[in-house]
Amino acid sequence: MGVRFLFNFFLISYIAIGQNDYIEYIPNTKEKLPMIFIKGGNFMMGSEKSEIGHFGDEGPKHEVKIDAFWIGKFEITWNLYNLFVSREIDQYQRSKSNSDEVSIDVDAVTGATTPYVEMSFGMGVDDFPAISMTQLAASKFCEWLSAMTGNFYRLPTEAEWEYACRAGSDSAFNFGDDISKLKDYAWYDENSEDKYQKVGTKNPNDWGIHDMHGNVAEWTLDQYSPISYRQRKDKLTENPFVEPIKVYPRVVKGGSWMDNQKRLRSASRRGSSKQWKRQDPQIPKSLWWHTDAQFLGFRVIRPLNTPPEKLQKKYWGY
């Protein structure tokens, strides 16, 4: 009886801990990463033609089922991203025996090169979102973060990102359709003063996530296709992911400090472009930086169910 009680106690404790928000502390640094738990569920992805600002690649609206995951409460900041770029704390990586989900040597993770120019472009570093990295660099950051913490992190799929952004809403924005309220939730071209702002300074959505509209647009894992939604018409699709087969274009979501209101809608999507490297002084162009994408950043997710090692590497750009 006592054994059964203890088993039930630990099982309940595991469930309670395993499906709550938490803070990931980066070993041997002052940095931390608050993570919000997102329950799995169904939602309608995309937008109707009647939605103000609708683009053709946002339809048809279709039903999607998403598994549970955690997502960063904030966009990744320079404070954290620069640890990856400088790699000064790699000597403190977790060993395999301390790793809960991943078993990789942090020294084996490819690191982004130090850029030739100051990549914040004078807009701010402390608690400001990191910008201008390529999708590969963002994915390698996720691999590095996984090695440092022992927990598996990756970029969100486009569907996961939109599910988290909407937070149960079915409107143009996660707070509704009243565009006059956008200034309370987002930094965009009308209020940003021509630069990004510190993360978390606007209202969060109903699930507690900040800056899903505006501040910086955000990378997802998917290859961009203007017709991908048509293939999901009139059926339920579980955890959709358009696996990349080429470098460009990849899906970017959320809109930024440079964008107008329509670009900040939950359904809005755009594809990346090699033109974002146009002013890159390196020859050949850098694998790690999009010098002309001063509007672009990312946030991370951690799936509730950790994938096998082979799939982890695929998510990290191998």
Predicted features by range, described:
Residues N20-F37:
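GGW-centered surface loops in extracellular recognition modules
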Residues G2-F9:
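Sec-dependent signal peptide recognition
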Residues D170-Y196:
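Chymotrypsin/trypsin-fold serine protease catalytic domain
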Residues L33, N151-F152, P204-W207:
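Short loop/turn microsegments at loop-to-beta-strand junctions
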Residues E51-V64, K96-S97, S169-D170, S192-K195, ...:
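Surface-exposed recognition segments
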Residues A186-H213, E243-K246:
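Short, well-ordered junction/capping motifs at the entry into regular secondary structure
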Residues S47-I52, K65-F175, L221-Y229, R302-Y318:
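Active-site microenvironments of metalloenzymes and redox enzymes
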Residues F10-G18:
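Hydrophobic h-region of N-terminal signal peptides that target proteins for export
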